[in-house]
Amino acid sequence: MQINKVKPNIRGKSTLFLLLVTIIWGWTFIWMKQSMNATSNILGINLAEEIEKEIVSFFVLMRFGIAAIFFILFYPPTRKGLKKLDIWKGGLILGALAWGGFFFQMLAIPNISPAVSAFLTSLYVVFTALIGVSMRRQKVTWTLGIGILLATFGAGILGLKEDQSVLDLFITFGIPEWLTILCAFIFGAHIIATDQITQKVDALQVTGTMLIIVSLLSLIAFLLIIIVQENLTYLDEIISLLVEPTFIFPLFMCAIFGSLLALLLLNIYQKHLSPVRAAILYGLEPVWAAIFSITIGLENTTKWLFAGAFCLLLGNLIVELRNSTEDKTIMEESE
């Protein structure tokens, strides 16, 4: 299906569903933070910090494991995909990319501020365009470039404190920051791969195999980390987190909404939009995260919050108001 041949009502519907995805992913920042904070309260700060990597890998394992189980149970027709080689190939590619992105993001979150994390993660908007140019010879127009830059810049300054400047985002780069940049690159690749794969195979079926692959990779990572770190003695403590409401509730929210529902909608509706336009829509994620954080008292309103929201929304508007002939040219040259 070519993007320029999609009916306006289908494109509009797809845009709304991808907007819903950004709202859900905005909440996941809060849910992940709540789960990590819960581990400190349950296990104690010292132990939680000592086995931080194990807890992170366990969280990713359970998040996608739960999502995979629920998906297979409630979408029986997709089980047919488990017998198809092309579905597994697509799921392997998407699953590996999704696992890499979420795993590196979670590794960095405990040691990075929400503002910097949101900004660096939003770089997948830029990476999507760059990967599209290098792999698919996709033309990026100057209007699209301006939109991407504005959206990325806006996402970056949303969480700055009142007395901070833009430079504060760049002067303290360490391992967590670079892990998040790697996460952003992988998410950009995932968007491109999703666009290509869901054009060829059933979106629901490939979502099922993708979730299974992410679960398996997460299990392998969890076991390797806990063995290498020689922390097998803490396995009982880690598993005991599953009976703690303050840990399991946000975990389930991430699994059912952040992983199952969001990725399902992404795989079904993203194919009706261009990859770069989809990435721009996803740039709204930090806006929702900021709004929700303010609502529940986790964030203070600053001049940077409003300036960032304005720049991000303006960037999206510039992209959406491009001349329709530019859309046609982009898709023709990507074939």
Residue ranges of model-derived segments:
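Loop-to-transmembrane-helix transition segments
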Residues: K13-T22, I72-F104, G174-C183, T233-L261, ...
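Membrane-interface helix-cap regions at the ends of transmembrane helices
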Residues: N4-K5, Q34, A38, G65-K83, ...
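C-terminal-most transmembrane helix of multi-pass membrane proteins
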Residues: Q2-P8, V60, F64-G65, T143, ...
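C-terminal transmembrane-helix exit sites in multi-pass transporters
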Residues: A48, Q105, Y124-L149, V287-A307
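Helix-helix packing/entry segments at the starts of transmembrane helices
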Residues: W99-F103, S117-L123, T194-L216, A255-T295
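Transmembrane alpha-helical segments that form core, pore/gating elements
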Residues: T22, I30-W31, A68-F71, T128-A129, ...
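Glycine-/small-residue-enriched transmembrane alpha-helix faces in small-molecule transporters
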Residues: M1-F58, F104, D168-Q196, S334-E335
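Transmembrane alpha-helices of multi-pass small-molecule transport proteins
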Residues: A38-G100, F127, I186-A193, G208-V228, ...
